[in-house]
Amino acid sequence: MEKERETLQVWKKRVEQELDRVIAFWMEHSHDQEHGGFFTCLGRDGKVYDHLKYVWLQGRQVWMYCRLYRSFERFRRVELLDAARAGGEFLLRYARVAPPGKKCAFVLTRDGRPVKVQRTIFSECFYTMAMNELWKVTGEVRYQSEAIEMMDQIIHWVREDPAGLGRPQLSGALATEPMAVPMMLLSLVEQLGEEDEELTNMYAELGDWCVHRILQHVQRDGQVVLENVSEDGKELPGCLGRHQNPGHTLEAGWFLLQYALRKGDPKLRMHIIDKFLLLPFHSGWDPEHGGLFYFQDADGLCPTQLEWNMKLWWPHSEAMIAFLMGYSDSGDPALLHLFYKVAEYTFRQFRDPEYGEWFGYLNQEGKVALTIKGGPFKGCFHVPRCLAMCEQILGALLQRLEPAPLDSSPAVSTHEGSK
């Protein structure tokens, strides 16, 4: 017990210090003081190499800053909140391509002019998360109104009519459900319903629907989790159907664990740990060099994606959260061992002790392939979210291990104590 406490304390300290360094990097290098919002195309030393702004990453950074401000005393700093507010106002002014329409751009110029639109829901989802979190820290109702209105639009696109996304309906295209869509909606249900009974009730059926859809990605009698299935939950033919993303499955795992904990469903929790934590880890971990493969093929064939055998920052971040949350819930020491294994690899290979933050892209052997710290797909999100959540879970675990205080008060009978 004492050794376990010491190891947890060491990791809590490491995680805490790393979170401070990561946030310091983004606060120093990413803020656009002229137009608001954030630069995410940052080199190893934080130098901006492109001024384009990616709406989903803008929303993620606003959310991250607000969540830190709200959750940690040491981050309750005016400059953090001011930057989050400036990012939120930038999104309010420029994210939507043709207001009052809700479709958001994917890429904006530095001063907010639209460059590119994606035919997906993800810019809108992170816009929603940003607005809701801004409301939680500022109390300004206009942010919450934006979040609820955008959430309604996203639900309409996903469950009723996707025409507004602009995707052409082609006769040869398979009707496909990527796991990312119900995952993202489940994350929004968790975000909006947090400490809000009215919204929890409003989105309860949606949350159940999302979980049902995610669980349909467990295929072949529970032997694999596939990234894409048909709309009725069947395996698809070809490379698309065999495609696996271990990191995404692990991220879905902790999303599902949060849901199962809220529901008080121990059977579901065990199913999630087995299929969404242990299964993707054992199939996705590189036995020779360590680290999680980015993509895999369910039949063991060579994936067609050029980056399939690379090691990326975010799957390892999500694995750290998943295994620590799984251990916190189940007490299974095997899950704590896997957390340590992933965390050791991640801290050793991804973090940059010289300039701060983490490298995002390693080759299979674990050597840095791209020296950039941010780009179109890597911003201030997966790394700090991982570190913040792990710090909180480690803190809660250590509290559980604290010896009970000596109580000198007289004993109370069970009957009296229950009154």
Swiss-Prot record:
Cited InterPro entries: 6-hairpin_glycosidase_sf (IPR008928), 6hp_glycosidase-like_sf (IPR012341), AGE/CE (IPR010819), AGE_dom (IPR034116)
GO terms classed as biological process: carbohydrate metabolic process; N-acetylglucosamine metabolic process; N-acetylneuraminate catabolic process
EC annotation from Swiss-Prot or TrEMBL: 5.1.3.8
Site (Important for enzyme activity): 380
Catalytic activity: an N-acyl-D-glucosamine = an N-acyl-D-mannosamine
Region ranges (Leucine-zipper): 185-206
Leading EC class: isomerase
Record's signal peptide: none
GO molecular function per UniProt: identical protein binding; N-acylglucosamine 2-epimerase activity; peptidase inhibitor activity
Superkingdom, natural source: Eukaryota
Residue(s) carrying Phosphoserine: 418
This protein's pathway: Amino-sugar metabolism; N-acetylneuraminate degradation
Alphabetic keyword roster: Isomerase, Phosphoprotein
Pfam families linked: GlcNAc_2-epim (PF07221)
Classification via CDD domains: AGE
Subunit structure of this chain's protein: Homodimer. Forms a heterodimer with renin and inhibits its activity.
Family classification: Belongs to the N-acylglucosamine 2-epimerase family.
Function: Catalyzes the interconversion of N-acetylglucosamine to N-acetylmannosamine. Involved in the N-glycolylneuraminic acid (Neu5Gc) degradation pathway.
Name of the protein in its database record: N-acylglucosamine 2-epimerase
Native source species: Mus musculus (Mouse)
Taxonomic placement: Eukaryota, Metazoa, Chordata, Craniata, Vertebrata
Name of the gene this protein is made from: Renbp
